[in-house]
């Protein structure tokens, strides 16, 4: 990695996301590819009212997230320290695709299958016309 990403505490995340203006700064458009939160000591869900416009990653020793456990349910991804670097590298390589995927999955949770497929098709079509996709395709 070029530089170690900042790892936020749950309290810092809440402070960021309580301000719509500050929350907006956490997006690919502002050069923020993801937010990493040290979630080792979380005991209850954060119940975030809004999510950032970039992937929200929980750093947790047990990355085998159990869907029955809702403590980490606000996060897009749960990784251990060993898994963090490859995940960050993937996000940095394709930040728009990573952000699009997170938004698609967040949005699709409460949709019908038909609505979710429409949203997925729109996202996929837009990504296929992106510079990032063309660059990736050229390396294949």
What are these regions (language model features)?
Residues 1-140:
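C-terminal alpha-helix plus adjacent terminal tail
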């Amino acid at each position: 990695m070029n530089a170690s990403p900042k790892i936020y505490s749950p309290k810092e995340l809440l402070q960021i996301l309580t301000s719509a203006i500050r929350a907006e700064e956490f997006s690919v458009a502002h050069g923020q590819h993801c937010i990493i939160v040290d979630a080792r000591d979380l005991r209850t869900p954060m119940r975030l009212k809004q999510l950032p416009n970039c992937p929200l990653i929980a750093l947790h020793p047990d990355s085998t997230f159990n869907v029955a456990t809702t403590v980490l349910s606000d996060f897009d991804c749960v990784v251990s320290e060993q898994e963090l670097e490859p995940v960050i590298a993937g996000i940095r390589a394709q930040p728009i695709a990573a952000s699009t995927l997170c938004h698609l999955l967040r949005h699709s949770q409460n949709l019908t299958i038909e609505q979710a497929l429409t949203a997925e098709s729109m996202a996929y079509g837009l990504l296929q016309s992106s510079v990032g996709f063309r660059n990736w395709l050229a390396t294949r």
